[in-house]
Amino acid sequence: MWIYSPPKRPKSKVPEDVKAAVTKQAEHLLEAWRPRHIKPPTPGYQFNYIVELCGTWFRSYFYLCAKYACPGPTALSPFFEARFARLEYVGDRRFNLAFMRHTGQWVELEQGLTIDQCFTSLREESFYQPA
């Protein structure tokens, strides 16, 4: 059966000043999180552990990522990167905030937030923090 599917509305392009403001606030947040989330492994530790926290832009999304080390002898690669939080630019200097669920699906909890509101939620809510 065929049905009409209207064209999707184009995503808002992120202005450079907004990108710079988000990147700056993210770096401050990640600096505060690094001592708490990046710990040296104990000798003989065989499980994945966080070695770096970073942020990156892709189209109209800003992702917070954790780089994990894989020390075990059966590891497929020595490192991998996992995204754990996402800010989606929706226009008018507003963002939707989502976290990565253990199933690999993004769960959007908050919509239409300002940059300051986004980073307040990131600081306060454990959903958005690396595991």
Model features per residue range: what roles?
Residues 2-72:
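Negatively charged, low-complexity tracts enriched in Asp/Glu with abundant Ser/Thr
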Residues 16, 77, 105-108:
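Short, charged/polar micro-motifs that form catalytic or ligand-binding hotspots
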Residues 62-95:
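Short, conserved beta-strand/beta-arch hydrophobic-aromatic motifs that form part
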Residues 86-131:
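Short, compact, well-ordered microdomains
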